[in-house]
């Protein structure tokens, strides 16, 4: 009686544990499904940022190739930069939430899902930093091109300025420093100064944008650098696992081929034996009738 009751209690406990495991598996599956939806959303946002960076490059070229001040293109450029800034801040915030969740879950036992989340987070972070690095380079390149444009226009206006002096004039933030000592009695001279002031204004906007994104950029870059070794190790293991699987598949195919050949040999031997035995029986019967 006592043994039966103990068995019943153990069976009930086992059922409860199975129910808990099933509930946990279902919860993990749903969590990972939501996680991958978030990953795809972030990846899509980063792709949009990358596309907008390409549009920024086109706007830069259009502005610099236009001899007159193109206000419409500049407004479109300002809007693109604002869109990139908003999207980048959102992506950074979402990546930060994932990072915090991973750090929290690392306090417990590690599992395959946690490793997957780490890898996905690191891959997204790397991609994001690559795109933002390209954007930062685009801005600094445009600054140098604007600076070169100012230098050429100053030369046209007859004002010789060295590179260091020009840099100081730009950093002063005062467009009036460019007009000192320049006679603006012709339309061409006025147009030249207007272009200089426009390029200087562009540089001021660029530097403001670069400063705004600098902290975010450095934060993400440091995160990616710290994750680099882990990701490289994971990629190495995955690559070697793939090679192992490929070799295993090839070996399996060879084994199947050898097995198939061996099977065919056995069948041929069996058929030959049957034919010989049948012929022998027919010969014996025929010989018996003759006798």
Curated annotation (Swiss-Prot):
- GO BP, one annotated term: vesicle fusion
The reply to whether Iron figures as a keyword in the UniProt entry is: no
- Domain named t-SNARE coiled-coil homology is located at 193-255
Spell out the subcellular localization from the entry: Cell membrane; Cell projection, Axon; Cell projection, Dendrite; Perikaryon
Major subcellular site: membrane
Per the record, the similarity remark reads: Belongs to the syntaxin family.
Q: What is this protein called?
A: Syntaxin-1A homolog
Organism from which the protein derives: Caenorhabditis elegans
**Lineage of producing organism:** Eukaryota, Metazoa, Ecdysozoa, Nematoda, Chromadorea
């Amino acid at each position: 009686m006592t043994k039966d009751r103990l068995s019943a209690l153990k069976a009930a406990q086992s059922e409860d544990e199975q129910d808990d495991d099933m509930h946990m598996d279902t919860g993990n599956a749903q969590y990972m499904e939501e996680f991958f939806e978030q990953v795809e959303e972030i990846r899509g946002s980063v792709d949009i940022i990358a596309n907008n960076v390409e549009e920024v490059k086109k706007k830069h070229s259009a502005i610099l190739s236009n001899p007159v001040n193109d206000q419409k293109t500049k407004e479109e450029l300002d809007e693109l930069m604002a869109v990139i800034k908003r999207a980048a801040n959102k992506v950074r915030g979402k990546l930060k939430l994932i990072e915090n969740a991973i750090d929290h879950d690392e306090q417990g036992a590690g599992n395959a899902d946690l490793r997957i989340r780490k890898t996905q987070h690191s891959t997204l972070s790397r991609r994001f930093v690559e795109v933002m690095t390209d954007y930062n380079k685009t801005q600094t390149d445009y600054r140098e091109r604007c600076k070169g444009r100012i230098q050429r226009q100053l030369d046209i206006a007859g004002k010789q300025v060295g590179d260091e002096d020009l840099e100081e004039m730009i950093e002063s933030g005062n467009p009036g420093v460019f007009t000192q000592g320049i006679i603006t009695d012709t339309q061409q001279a006025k147009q030249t100064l207007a272009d200089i002031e426009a390029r200087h204004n562009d540089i001021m906007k660029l530097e403001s944008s670069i400063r705004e994104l600098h902290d975010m950029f450095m934060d993400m870059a440091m995160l990616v650098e710290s994750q680099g070794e882990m990701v490289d190790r994971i990629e190495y293991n995955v690559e070697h696992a793939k090679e192992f699987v490929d070799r295993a598949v090839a070996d399996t195919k060879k084994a199947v081929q050898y097995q198939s050949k061996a099977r065919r040999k056995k069948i041929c031997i069996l058929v030959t034996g049957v034919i010989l035995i049948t012929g022998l029986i027919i010969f014996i019967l025929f010989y018996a009738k003759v006798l």
